[in-house]
UniProtKB/Swiss-Prot annotation:
Binding sites annotated in the UniProt record for GTP: 17-24, 88-92, 142-145
Places the protein is found: Cytoplasm
Species of provenance: Acinetobacter baumannii (strain ATCC 17978 / DSM 105126 / CIP 53.77 / LMG 1025 / NCDC KC755 / 5377)
Described purpose of this protein according to its UniProt entry: Catalyzes the GTP-dependent ribosomal translocation step during translation elongation. During this step, the ribosome changes from the pre-translocational (PRE) to the post-translocational (POST) state as the newly formed A-site-bound peptidyl-tRNA and P-site-bound deacylated tRNA move to the P and E sites, respectively. Catalyzes the coordinated movement of the two tRNA molecules, the mRNA and conformational changes in the ribosome.
Gene: fusA
Protein name: Elongation factor G
Record family assignment: Belongs to the TRAFAC class translation factor GTPase superfamily. Classic translation factor GTPase family. EF-G/EF-2 subfamily.
């Protein structure tokens, strides 16, 4: 089957935003105007097509990025048909991993901002992730019909808060309840959408007299931005004082693709205005798969040679599994982004990360949670495969004869954990299966069994994250679970260098055990080193044979899993084996492993050991009246206020760093202090030393035989 849409007419885009900026409604409108969805789904009544998980409909927030394919030929059918793959990403901080995951496979993004709330904390997080993956983007200021809407204020905030370079290509006609349409600065005409057809039809009109000067000023700004794309355009502009429509689009496109500028539009998705022009901008300014840098990977050879795969059907097949979901009808759905080559139903693919070959059952194109079977996928496509058993998020799938491992995704370590147990013994096995599947879908969610207590521990990125996991166990797998109190993932480390002997000697009849080492423990700067532990050796003259170095390292690492101070994992240590002795007969791997473990245990306690706790970046938005109470409460929680911003409508944004241990139950407390009017967001910032008085309580509990983590 030949390719139906040329790859140059593909756009793989993400729609990304802060909670309540109206992102899901915007996506809904895209599906409506591109003809996929007949009745517009509103989040207000819990019926949006993209928010397909039940919890999302209840909570009104988007949790998983559903991928949808649609087609667009322009508001006035001015383009040949383009294929747009839309990935809807969540806007809640606990789900930042989902955003990160979708950024990896996108070619361009559309950032949605609220015309009233503007650039909010989560917007900054998403912006940083888009910078990290160098994703070209445009911005859409939504909710122009709301009281307090101000397009130009959001333009300013993008500059000051995000360090962005926004270039509006439309300006609004009116605002709040007088918002009627936009002035298109490229055409220099007013666009008015037809209410009766829910915005499917529109007409160009004259620019309202009171807007002519504003429009002219912003048009000049836009034309200058386009002219800076090349010397040729700049010369033309300086000679003629203006640029043609084609030149403006070419200049803005070149600079958007280079991430130098962000084209800005506005509208009201809810009122069916503006999304149509934004779709045109996606085609005009965002890249096709052939216009972004070719994906890089590592070949399957001794030297791990770097290689890239061009976005072409002729290149060997390569794809990235960026999301795994469990579907009650077909089982595992693996969402893949195809970077090169063609994959047909029934083909075998190779997974170099797991060194396994698997066969593809069906290939389905998703529209939110409805699916359509297709025969093949080609470079640039995003689709879901059925029947892959051993694939995890972030794995590469490729052609067996041309093996390549694409860059893996990095997932943050969880910061919060809690114990779960099934309400009935009968549910034990069901719970294990459920947790296993959920962990496969979501790499930022981890499950392990506590060795001391035998309890099942689940860990994630925040309270909401774990709430939703427990909720999904109940809904999708029918497992009722009791959950324990949340526990903080503390860490242990050292502050000074020490040298320590470690000796393991056992003498019984016959062959004994003998391992003897001297190890130097040094503090390691985790951030600078890019790792949490390092092992080195400086053994001279073979006093410890080479074959036992690995055993010493292993002994130390095993001891680090459950630290010496309070049983928490140890980080930030460099261990150097520099001396020791051995016995020809009695020395073996186990002896040196034990010697290494003892040296670490004893040395650690002399190296000025400390407990580290996760510190969260917290941002609270509150009406000014409650600011004093909120600040006082953050201080009581050992918070350090970093700064404050004034937001529109007399609201203040308070930025602080607060230990996670002090943040449990914060949402309830904050709501009661502000009569439900304050909101907050929280994300992991760093690990920092726990104050002595707090650490002493945790250590004392551990030494008295209490379990780690049951600190209040």
């Amino acid at each position: 089957m030949a390719r139906q849409t040329p790859i140059t007419r593909y756009r793989n885009i993400g729609i990304s935003a802060h909670i309540d900026a109206g992102k899901t409604t915007t996506t809904e409108r895209i599906l409506f105007y591109t003809g996929v969805s007949h009745k517009i789904g509103e989040v207000h009544d819990g019926a949006a097509t993209m928010d397909w998980m039940e919890q999302e409909q209840e909570r009104g927030i988007t949790i998983t990025s559903a991928a949808t394919t649609c087609f667009w030929s322009g508001m006035g059918n001015q383009f040949p048909q383009h294929r747009i793959n839309v990935i809807d990403t969540p806007g809640h901080v606990d789900f930042t991993i989902e955003v990160e995951r979708s950024m990896r496979v996108l070619d361009g993004a559309c950032m949605v901002y609220c015309a009233v709330g503007g650039v909010q904390p989560q917007s900054e997080t998403v912006w940083r992730q888009a910078n990290k993956y160098k994703v070209p983007r445009l911005a859409f200021v939504n909710k122009m019909d709301r009281t307090g809407a101000n397009f130009f204020r959001v333009v300013e905030q993008m500059k000051t808060r995000l360090g962005a370079n926004p270039v509006p290509i439309v300006v609004p006609i009116g605002a709040e309840d007088t918002f009627t349409g936009v002035v298109d600065l490229i055409e220099m005409k007013a666009i008015i959408w037809d209410e009766a057809s829910q915005g499917m039809k529109f007409e160009y009109g004259e620019i309202p007299a009171d807007l002519v000067d504003t429009a002219q000023e912003w048009r000049t700004n836009m034309v200058e931005a386009a002219a800076e794309a090349s010397e040729e355009l700049m010369d033309k502009y300086l000679e003629e004082g203006d640029l043609s429509k084609e030149d403006i689009i070419a200049g803005l496109r070149a600079r958007t693709l280079a991430s130098e500028i962000q084209v800005m539009l506005c509208g009201s998705a809810f009122k069916n205005k503006g999304v149509q022009r934004m779709l045109d901008a996606v085609i005009e300014f965002l890249p096709s798969p052939t216009e972004v840098k070719a994906i890089e990977g590592i070949l399957d050879d001794k030297d791990e040679t770097k290689a890239s795969r061009e976005a072409s059907d002729e290149a060997p097949f390569s794809a990235l599994a960026f999301k795994i979901m469990n579907d009650k009808f077909v089982g595992n759905l693996t969402f893949v982004r195809v970077y090169s080559g063609v994959l047909k139903q029934g083909d075998a693919v190779y997974n170099p990360v797991k060194s396994k070959r698997e066969r593809i059952g069906r290939i389905v194109q998703m529209h939110a949670n409805e699916r359509q079977d297709i025969d093949e996928i080609r470079a640039g496509d995003i689709a879901a495969c059925v029947g892959l058993k051993d694939v995890t998020t972030g794995d590469t799938l490729c052609d067996e004869k041309n093996i390549i491992t694409l860059e893996r995704m990095e997932f943050p370590d969880p910061v919060i954990q809690l114990a779960v147990e099934p309400k009935t013994k009968a549910d034990q096995e069901k719970m294990s299966i459920a947790l296993g599947r959920l962990a496969k879908e979501d790499p930022s969610f981890r499950v392990h069994t506590d060795e001391e207590s035998g309890q099942t521990i689940i860990a994630g990125m925040g309270e909401l994250h774990l709430d939703i996991i427990v909720d999904r166990m109940k809904r999708e797998f029918g497992v009722e679970a009791n959950i324990g109190k949340p526990m903080v993932a503390y860490r242990e480390t050292i502050k000074k260098t020490v040298e320590q002997e470690g000796k393991f000697v056992r003498q019984t009849g016959g062959k004994g055990k003998f391992g003897h080492v001297y190890v130097r423990l040094e503090p390691l700067d985790v951030e600078a080193a890019g790792k949490e532990y390092e092992f080195a050796e400086e053994v001279v003259g073979g006093v410890v044979p080479k074959e036992f170095f690995g055993a010493v390292d292993k002994g130390i690492q095993e001891r680090m899993k459950n630290g010496v101070l309070a049983g928490y994992p140890v980080v930030g240590v460099k261990a150097v084996l520099f001396d020791g002795s051995y016995h020809d007969v009695d020395s073996d791997e186990l002896s040196f492993k034990m010697a290494g473990s003892y040296a670490f245990r004893d040395g650690f306690m002399k190296a000025d050991p400390v407990l580290l706790e996760p510190i969260m970046k917290v941002e609270v938005e509150t009406p000014e009246d409650y600011m004093g109470d909120i600040m006082g409460d953050l201080n009581r929680r050992r918070g350090m206020v970093q700064g404050m911003d004034d937001l529109p409508g007399g609201t203040k944004a308070i930025k602080a760093e607060v230990p996670l241990a002090e943040m449990f139950g914060y949402a309830t407390q904050m709501r009661s202090m502000s009569q439900g009017r304050a909101t907050y967001s929280m994300e992991f910032a760093k690990y920092a030393e726990t104050p002595r008085n707090v650490a002493e309580g945790i250590i004392a509990k551990f030494q008295a035989g209490g379990k780690k983590g049951d600190d209040e």
